Every structure is written in C-alpha cells, then in structure tokens.
Design a protein with these regions (language model features):
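Structural preference for solvent-exposed beta-strand-turn elements
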Residues: 1-212
Length: 212
C-alpha cells in the first residue's frame, strides 16, 4: 500500500479541508492535518467504490451536505448500511444515482451482520467446477447485485451454480451458494461485467483456459 498512488484520494480529502504533508507527495507515509471546519463537497463518482465510501464517511463528519453523483453503478455496501440505519443519507435513483449526506449528525451504535465475501467464494467455486464429480455448499455469502458478476457469467455459460436460502439484513442480500461440477462453454464477457467481476477476472482466466 505504501507504493500505491493516493493522489485521487488526497485531492478529494483536500476539498473537505484536510491537509497532507509533504505536499506533492502522493503515497504513504503522509502526515494528515485535519480541519476544525470540514465543509461538504459535490463529487462526481467514477467506478471506484473505495473513493465513494471515503467521500461518504468524510461527508458524515462535515458541515452542510455532501452530494455524490454516480453515472456508473459501483459497489454500494456503505450507502446500503447507512440508509438502512440512519437518517443522515438520502439516495435518488434515475439516469444518475445521487447520494446526499447530511453531516455532523449524532449516530447511534448498531449491530451489523457481515456476510461472507463473494470474491473469496469465487476461488472455491472455480475449484469445484473444474473437478469432476464435485459439489460444494458455501453458506452465508453476500449476494449484492454489484458483486455477483462472476457467478452470473459462469451460469450463463453452463455452470451449475444456484443461490438458495436468500435473505436480507441491513439492506444487504445474502444466501447460500450451491455448486456442482460440469461442462462449461467457452467464456465471453461483455463490458457489463467489468465492475461486477473486477476482482474475479484472474480466476475467470484460469477457468477459461481449462474449459473445452
């Protein structure tokens, strides 16, 4: 992480009033100097859910409102959790998704159920699909619509994958994944899977290499 370029994050947090030292350095370690008067901003989101979540959390601690305008759908765990439990956030859905955060509000503590990671489940799913006469049940996996592109793509190409015992908690859908080995057609992924299967592309490449 120390080698990762944080320029986008630094620029955004600077708009809230934060200061980073030394200046013109965009990777960690950095010294962060907070401000006593953080002011909400308007932010046009890209596909990075991490940057969007950073803006949401910074907006919670800023005066006034912070607006996030989202043209492309990205992972939405943070806003799902907040809108379910607090009145500090509003979401308008249309051609563009607009998230508005009202900062400096008191937040009550809550209990959160965190389901299993679908990206981790993808590796065990691949192992089962590629081994003859194999079956697997993975319990309590997050099935958020922005996270299941890997499974949707494989099902489209013949993989025997089923979601069962589906339920909802804190605005998050989760359930059990049932996998049975079998023949998979050659994979072809359109651009709509880009954000929904970003982390799973390496294992998809392996599956594609081993299918007939």
């Amino acid at each position: 992480l120390n080698k990762r370029n944080m320029k986008k994050l630094i620029v955004i947090m600077s708009e809230f009033g934060a200061e980073f030292l030394p200046k013109n350095k965009f990777n960690f370690p950095l010294k962060l100097i907070s401000t006593e008067m953080p002011i909400g901003i308007n932010y046009k989101a890209g596909v990075s859910a991490q940057l969007k979540s950073a803006v949401i959390l910074a907006g919670l601690n800023s005066f006034g409102s912070t607006k996030i305008i989202e043209d492309e759908k990205s992972r939405d765990h943070t806003e799902n959790m907040l809108i379910k439990n607090f009145k500090t956030i509003k979401i308008k859905r249309g051609k563009k998704k607009i998230i508005e955060i009202f900062g400096k509000k008191y937040l009550n503590s809550i209990n959160i159920n965190v389901p299993g990671d679908p990206s981790s489940a993808a590796f065990f799913t691949a192992l089962t699909l590629l081994n003859k006469n194999s079956s697997l049940k993975i319990k309590n996996v997050g099935l958020n619509s922005t996270r299941v592109g890997f499974f949707q793509l494989l099902k489209k190409h013949g993989a025997n994958i089923k979601f069962k015992n589906i339920r909802k908690d804190n605005n998050e859908i989760y359930g059990d994944i049932y996998v049975t080995s079998g023949k998979i057609k050659p994979l072809k992924a359109s651009s709509k899977y880009y954000t929904k299967a970003t982390d799973e592309y390496p294992i998809l490449f392996i599956i594609a290499a081993l299918t007939q």
